[in-house]
């Protein structure tokens, strides 16, 4: 599990090799739009806090944990390396999930590609059925977590899945993440209060189908 999480985190940065090389640090990605661009579905205030505070905290914590892990491994301290696993998974997953989430959203997200729409109809019957199934599963997440549309490389099918907390989809299920819905309360509470279904149903209005379609095409390669 730890190896899978590390592998997913490593995809976000360019690996640096060599004994004398300086290890790269993770950084907070810029958003491909302004904080107010997703209104009225998601407010400027939520977007700014979510990005600058919550995601930034995952990035900072992840860098600190990786420093500690590097030190533990270099000293052969297996006990310390194991003790760092939960924090690595949580903060690494938070960075991975949010980096996908931002690109999954857009003011004018368009429509699924012909190839993706064909797959959706094959696996769910219709786009409407997919939206209903993913929305229902996401709303039903107990506590904090994520709802996902993922692609199963082995079965070559689309699947709906949920993950608790910040567990990264690919590292924990083997599904390639295509579209994610964040249902941590910080993602919606300032605007939607305790009515999670309203937030989940509204997010489809800003789904970036171009990005989802590109992820689907890449996942099949």
UniProtKB/Swiss-Prot annotation:
For this protein, what is the EC number?
1.15.1.1
Highest taxon of the lineage: Eukaryota
Give the family per the record.
Answer: Belongs to the iron/manganese superoxide dismutase family.
**Function of the protein:** Destroys superoxide anion radicals which are normally produced within the cells and which are toxic to biological systems.
The terms describing its cellular component in GO are: mitochondrial matrix; mitochondrion; respiratory chain complex
Q: Name one GO molecular function term.
A: superoxide dismutase activity
How, per the record, is the cofactor bound?
Binds 1 Mn(2+) ion per subunit.
Under which name does UniProt file this protein? Superoxide dismutase [Mn] 1, mitochondrial
Annotated Pfam families: Sod_Fe_C (PF02777), Sod_Fe_N (PF00081)
Q: Encoded by which gene? A: sod-2
The transit peptide of this chain lies at 1-24
According to its UniProt record, which reaction does this protein catalyse? Answer: 2 superoxide + 2 H(+) = H2O2 + O2
């Amino acid at each position: 599990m730890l190896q899978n999480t590390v592998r997913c985190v490593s995809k976000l940065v360019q690996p640096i090799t060599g004994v004398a090389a300086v290890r790269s640090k993770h950084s907070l990605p810029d958003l491909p739009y302004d904080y107010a661009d997703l209104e009225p579905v998601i407010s400027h205030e939520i977007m700014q806090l979510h990005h600058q505070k919550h995601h930034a905290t995952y990035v900072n914590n992840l860098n600190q944990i990786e420093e500690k892990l590097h030190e533990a491994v270099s000293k052969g301290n297996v006990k310390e390396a194991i003790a760092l696993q939960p924090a690595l998974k949580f903060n690494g997953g938070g960075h991975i999930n949010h980096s996908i989430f931002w690109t999954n959203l857009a003011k004018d997200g368009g429509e699924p590609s012909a190839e993706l729409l064909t797959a959706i109809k094959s696996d769910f019957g219709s786009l409407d059925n997919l939206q209903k199934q993913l929305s229902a599963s996401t709303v039903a997440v107990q506590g904090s977590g994520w709802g996902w549309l993922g692609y199963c490389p082995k079965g070559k099918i689309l699947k709906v899945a949920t993950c608790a907390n910040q567990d990264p989809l690919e590292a924990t299920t083997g599904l390639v993440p295509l579209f994610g819905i964040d249902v941590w309360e910080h993602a919606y509470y300032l605007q939607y209060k305790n009515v999670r279904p309203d937030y989940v149903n509204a997010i489809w209005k800003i789904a970036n189908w171009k990005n989802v379609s590109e992820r689907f095409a890449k996942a099949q390669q």
